[in-house]
A protein has these predicted regions:
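A conserved mid-protein helix/loop that constitutes part of the nucleotide-sugar donor-binding site
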Residues: 19-24, 178, 182-201, 218-222, ...
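Short His-centered aromatic/hydrophobic patch
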Residues: 91-97, 114
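Donor nucleotide-sugar binding/catalytic pocket of nucleotide-sugar-dependent glycosyltransferases
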Residues: 131-169
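Nucleotide-activated donor-binding/catalytic signature segment of Leloir-type glycosyltransferases, i.e.
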Residues: 222-239
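Short alpha-helical donor nucleotide-sugar binding micro-motif in glycosyltransferases
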Residues: 238-239, 246-251
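Aromatic "clamp/platform" in nucleotide-sugar-dependent glycosyltransferases that forms part
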Residues: 259
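Short hydrophobic beta-strand element within catalytic cores of glycosyltransferases
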Residues: 276-280
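Conserved acidic donor-binding segment of nucleotide-sugar-dependent glycosyltransferases
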Residues: 292-293, 297-304, 313-318
Length: 391
C-alpha cells in the first residue's frame, strides 16, 4: 500500500500574517485524500514572541534551533527529521525550509509562497528556483514581479488569493469617540512608530479617538515609551485568533501605516467585519481591497498628516464611515471568502505530481560561512562561535 500523500506547511512560529494565512488554509480545508501537517520553526535568536495557539493540522510540530551559533547543516538535518520522505507537498513560507529542500530530497513537490512585495521573498524565489516546483502568490503585483524575475517559469507561477472568515456579526455604529485599532506585529517595518504622531496630529485638530493596539513584537517597549503621553491606549498584547476576530466588532477604523506588505490578513479580517481601513498606499495588493474614498483610505507611506486627515474625516462624517464600512465588507465577502479560496489551493495541491520537476544532480547549499560544513560537528561550531563572540 502506498503512503498517503501529505501537505506540510513549514512556517515561522511567530505573530504575523504568515501564521494567519496558514491557519485559514488549514481551518477551511475539505477532505481531499491528503493528510496535513504544520512544522513551526522558531529561532532562539529572534526577538519575536512565539505563538502557542494550536494549528488545525493532523500533525502540529515545533522545531527549535539557534542560528547562529549552530552549524546550519546540523540544523537542516534535524529539520529533515520532521518531514519524513514521502509523497505530497511542502508549502514553504520562509528561507529555512527552502534551504532544506535545496539539498535534501523529501520526495515531495515544493510550493513556495511569496508573502510580500519585497526583496526578501523575490530573492528567495530566484535563489531556489531550481528546487521550487511551483511559485504561489496572492496579488497581481507580486505575480507580475515573479514573472519578470523568472520568465522561464511562467507556467509554474500561480496567482491564488487567500481568504478569511466572513462573520455574521459585524461592527455596529456607536456614538462618541471614534474607535481606532492597530492589529499586527509591533515592529518598525510595520510603521508602528507613526501611531503616536498620527494621534498627536488628530488631537491638534480636535479629534480624540479611543486607541487599541493588538499584537506583540520586538519593538513593543520602545513604542510604549514613544507613546507615553497617552495613558489610555489599550494594549491588548498577543491574543489568539478568536479573540482578535471578536475585537473587530467593537472598532470603527483599522490603521496600518506599514512600510511594506503583501496583502495583510488583518486588512481582510477587519474588512470582513466592516472595520474601515486607513492603510499605506502600497502597490503590493492594498488597491485590490481599498478603493480610496470608497472602501477606505490609502494615504502615502509615512505621511502622518494624510493618515490623520483620513481618520478625522471619518470621525466627523459618520454617514461616510458607515458607507465605507459596508463597501469594504462587500469587497472582502465577494472576493476573499475563505471557503472558496481554500478550495483553489487544494486543487493546486492535487496537481503536485504533474508540477514536480526533476531535482538538480549536484545541489548546493547557498547559506553559511566557512564553519558551516556538513563534516564539522555542531558542538565544535557552537564552541568556536561562542568563543569568538566573547572576544
Amino acid at each position: 500500500m502506498s503512503a498517503r500523500p501529505e501537505v506540510v506547511y513549514v512556517l515561522p512560529n511567530k505573530l504575523g500574517g504568515v501564521f494567519s494565512y496558514v491557519h485559514q488554509l488549514l481551518a477551511h480545508r475539505r477532505p481531499d485524500g491528503f493528510s496535513y501537517a504544520a512544522v513551526r520553526t522558531q529561532n532562539a535568536r529572534d526577538r519575536d514572541h512565539n505563538i502557542f495557539e494550536p494549528l488545525p493540522a493532523d500533525r502540529d510540530v515545533r522545531f527549535e534551533y539557534s542560528l547562529p551559533p549552530e552549524n546550519v547543516h546540523a540544523v537542516l538535518r534535524r529539520l529533515a527529521l520532521t518531514i519524513p520522505f514521502g509523497p505530497g507537498v511542502i508549502v514553504a513560507n520562509d528561507w529555512i525550509e527552502l534551504a532544506l529542500t535545496s539539498i535534501h530530497d523529501t520526495g515531495r513537490a515544493v510550493f513556495a509562497i511569496n508573502h510580500g512585495d519585497m526583496d526578501f521573498y523575490y530573492n528567495l524565489a530566484v535563489r531556489h528556483q531550481e528546487t521550487i516546483d511551483a511559485f504561489v502568490t496572492y496579488t497581481e503585483q507580486m505575480a507580475r514581479r515573479l514573472r519578470e524575475l523568472l520568465p522561464d517559469r511562467e507556467e509554474s507561477i500561480f496567482l491564488l488569493p487567500y481568504g478569511v472568515d466572513i462573520p455574521r456579526a459585524v461592527r455596529q455604529p456607536k456614538p462618541g469617540p471614534l474607535r481606532v485599532l492597530y492589529v499586527g506585529r509591533l515592529s518598525r517595518d510595520k510603521g508602528v512608530f507613526d501611531l503616536p504622531f498620527i494621534d498627536r496630529r488628530l488631537r491638534d485638530v480636535g479629534v480624540n479617538p479611543v486607541w487599541t493596539v493588538q499584537g506583540g513584537g520586538p519593538d513593543e517597549d520602545e513604542l510604549r515609551t514613544a507613546w507615553a503621553d497617552r495613558l489610555d491606549v489599550r494594549w491588548f498584547g498577543q491574543r489568539d485568533k478568536a479573540d482578535v476576530l471578536r475585537m473587530y466588532e467593537h472598532h470603527d477604523v483599522l490603521v496600518m501605516p506599514s512600510r511594506q506588505e503583501g496583502l495583510p490578513v488583518a486588512l481582510l479580517e477587519a474588512g470582513a467585519a466592516g472595520v474601515v481601513p486607513v492603510v499605506s498606499d502600497l502597490a503590493s495588493g492594498i488597491p485590490e481591497v481599498v478603493e480610496s474614498g470608497v472602501s477606505g483610505y490609502r494615504p502615502a507611506v509615512g505621511q502622518i498628516g494624510a493618515f490623520a486627515e483620513a481618520i478625522a474625516a471619518l470621525d466627523r462624517d459618520r454617514t461616510r464611515l458607515e458607507a465605507m464600512s459596508g463597501a469594504v465588507r462587500d469587497v472582502v465577502a465577494t472576493r476573499f471568502n475563505a471557503i472558496q479560496r481554500t478550495a483553489d489551493y487544494q486543487r493546486l495541491f492535487g496537481r503536485w505530481r504533474d508540477l514536480k520537476r526533476p531535482r538538480p544532480k549536484n545541489p548546493k547549499l547557498r547559506y553559511g560561512s566557512r564553519l558551516d560544513k556538513p563534516w564539522i560537528p555542531n558542538i565544535a561550531v557552537r564552541l568556536i562561535r561562542s568563543t569568538m563572540s566573547r572576544r
